[in-house]
Curated annotation (Swiss-Prot):
Segments forming domain Thyroglobulin type-1: 210-285
Gene3D superfamilies: 4.10.40.20, Thyroglobulin type-1
SMART domains hit by this protein: IB (SM00121), TY (SM00211)
Domain of life: Eukaryota
Tissues expressing this chain: Plasma; expressed by most tissues.
Modifications the protein undergoes after translation, according to the UniProt entry: Phosphorylated by FAM20C in the extracellular medium. Phosphorylated by CK2; resulting in decreased nuclear localization.
Name by which UniProt lists this protein: Insulin-like growth factor-binding protein 3
Biased composition (Polar residues): 146-155, 191-202
Gene (name only): IGFBP3
GO cellular component terms given for this protein: extracellular space; insulin-like growth factor ternary complex; nucleus
Residue ranges, compositional bias (Basic and acidic residues): 177-190
Gene Ontology biological-process entries: apoptotic process; MAPK cascade; negative regulation of smooth muscle cell migration; negative regulation of smooth muscle cell proliferation; osteoblast differentiation; positive regulation of apoptotic process; positive regulation of insulin-like growth factor receptor signaling pathway; positive regulation of MAPK cascade
Keyword Ligase carried by entry: no
Amino acid sequence: MLRARPALWAAALTALTLLRGPPAARAGAGTMGAGPVVRCEPCDARAVAQCAPPPPSPPCAELVREPGCGCCLTCALREGQPCGVYTERCGSGLRCQPPPGDPRPLQALLDGRGLCANASAVGRLRPYLLPSASGNGSESEEDHSMGSTENQAGPSTHRVPVSKFHPIHTKMDVIKKGHAKDSQRYKVDYESQSTDTQNFSSESKRETEYGPCRREMEDTLNHLKFLNMLSPRGIHIPNCDKKGFYKKKQCRPSKGRKRGFCWCVDKYGQPLPGFDVKGKGDVHCYSMESK
């Protein structure tokens, strides 16, 4: 019984590892120059016991560990055979490389259209790669797991370095700059709106009479700031006079072609007797609205 294949995001990180060219030098604990770490579950005795028997030696020239976080053994791919993120690993001294001149090398590895080639023949990837740092002397754990038999069943940690893929690197910089510019613009707009709201509240508090209608209107506007969607059907903004009290005529918003109904209230918002709250058509409130 074979273990499950790795998740798609782990596969994408593995593909970026395949494209990064010569391995970066490691110092100390081996974390310098490394990117995100994908930690796999340990290949204990129970996990190994679930593996099917390894293929016989005559057909397989070399046995390697399964791709990703697999613990079982499988046949290694020979030089020139198709390979990719989800296929078996290449044999010792080989590395899965995208076809020369492919405009989308990362997608080629995800689709299994790569080729097992000599690990030292990195010149084929030179058009796609950034210049690597000098002093590269040892391969990372991911290189061993992708192209050799040294990484067998056991606890494994795939250390995925930062991508050296030039087009992705350039596009990511452009995207990050765009996001930073949008975030700054949103911050300025938000601070401006917050300042306007604070000024409005300060001016209203300085008024001699702070009526109930004005308080309801401010509560409604403050509530709208936290809504993701604005639906005029469920929102009622009261009709207030200059002193913050209710005007005689209050109306609901229209719903498409259907006009909203109106009703009459006193200065405190209480419906006046003798007027249908859901009356249709124009409602003429007695005692003209206060100016």
